[in-house]
Amino acid sequence: VYTEPAFLTGPSAVEGRRTMHLGIDVFAPAGSAVFAPLDGHVVAAVNRNAHLDYGGGLVRAHSDDRGTPFYTLFGHLDPHSIAGMANGQAVTAGQQVASLGEAAVNGGWQPHLHFQMAYCLPDIIGTTVDDWPGAGDPDDLAFAAALYPNPAELLGLAPEPYLYPVVSAETL
């Protein structure tokens, strides 16, 4: 899937590919309920309906025990399930916030939740707060990891099984 033009960031098909997934995907049937893992408030509820985009997307703001802000993104939702969400709306842990969308409304993907965490919102001219890359270029791993940490623990998952091992040149 990362061979599609939407994931090309460089001048040719052999460089500059966004092939490193930056979130966790949880596969379930379309229509499955999506629940908030933590308290927070809505920053954006959008329909990014381009092919291979998020479809329905929900960005929420949170803060850790020290008051440091961070953000979470739910992608590939049914846009109708988040239509009533308003910016600033409080959401409590355990509350149903959306349902998964079918491929026809979720960017063309098999139904699943894309869950991602970020330490800051996009702030580049021409972007919006919901304009998160779901995949990054492996050459930018350190940068991507600093902005988009592994969200496994927020879902009650151990982070270790979700990190790919480094493959040596000899093995390749």
Where are these regions (language model features)?
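Short beta-strand micro-motifs in enzyme catalytic cores
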Residues: 24, 56-58, 111-113
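Short alpha-helix capping/helix-loop boundary micro-motifs
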Residues: 27-29, 77-85
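Residue-level recognition of short, solvent-exposed, well-ordered loop/turn junctions
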Residues: 29, 35, 86-92
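Acidic, glycine-rich catalytic/binding loops that coordinate metals and/or anionic ligands
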Residues: 83, 89-105, 109-172
